[in-house]
Amino acid sequence: MKKIPLVFSGCLLGLVGAGNLLADSLPFLAHAFSLTGLFFWFFFVVYHAIRWQETKIELQQPALLSGMATFPMAGMILSTYLLRLFPAFGGLSQLVWWSAFLLDLGLILYFTKTHVLARPRANATPSWTVLYVGIAVAALTYPVVGIREIAYLALVIGFGLTFLLYPLIYHDLKQSPLPSHLLGQEGIYCAPFSLLLAALVRVGGASLPTWFLLIMVVASQGFYFFVLTRLPKMITEGFQPAFSALTFPTVITATSLKMAQGLLQLPFLTVLVWMETFLCLLILVAVLGGYVAYLRE
């Protein structure tokens, strides 16, 4: 059996994100995804801790290290599941949340020091948005700790870095395109605006102006449909571990649309929510199946 690659962390985030998406509509399936994500999250920690010397060498690659923010992001979402599962043990959920949040911050600071401020600067890739905008998961999950100020700060940082990173990534990829084995990272393009939309709805709720919600929905969906146009090229290249980058972005896009629709109440969006929910689950299961086949080769 092959070594479980670090990029599998993206599937962990996809699994727990799917559990969160289905929590109020298909609770049995939501538990299945969340528990599977919880199991593999802990397994992933132990597996790579045992092989730390190998893992440490792999983490020297900027494109890989930046994508590892999916691990603490999954931890923050898992904390919300633990709170639902064990409401009497709120301290456990808060411990997981704070540990994941601080790990995410530490990863951001370390990456910035070693790969952004260093000269020459590493080429920006789509996974940079996972690292820098992914902190907005703190705003999406802030009720676990109940500190709104963290949510506001995470949103401000997320928005600011989104508008900074897209042009930078575009510029760098024009100079140095993604290699074929990293094409799956193109799935990340739809994640930032979708995550920010979901976090905004969580924090702002009904106080959000309708026009602003619509702008965010259009931005989120625009990048989502762009990603869908890239799928045929990715598929023709054959399965790659980097396909894990397709899981959470499509899940959070469906989640954000569902949350926004709860406020907008536009009939045609209901159909779109169910279509995107089905598609993101199909992608998640297909990628997990691809991993099973890949690891058994």
Region spans (language model):
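Juxtamembrane helix-loop boundaries in multi-pass membrane proteins
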Residues: 1-19, 54-80, 97, 113-140, ...
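Helix-coil boundary and interhelical linker segments in multi-pass alpha-helical membrane proteins
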Residues: 20-30, 82-94, 140-152, 200-212, ...
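Structural signature of hydrophobic alpha-helical transmembrane segments
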Residues: 29-43, 90-105, 148-162, 210-221, ...
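Membrane-interface capping segments at transmembrane-helix boundaries
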Residues: 49-53, 229-233, 289-297
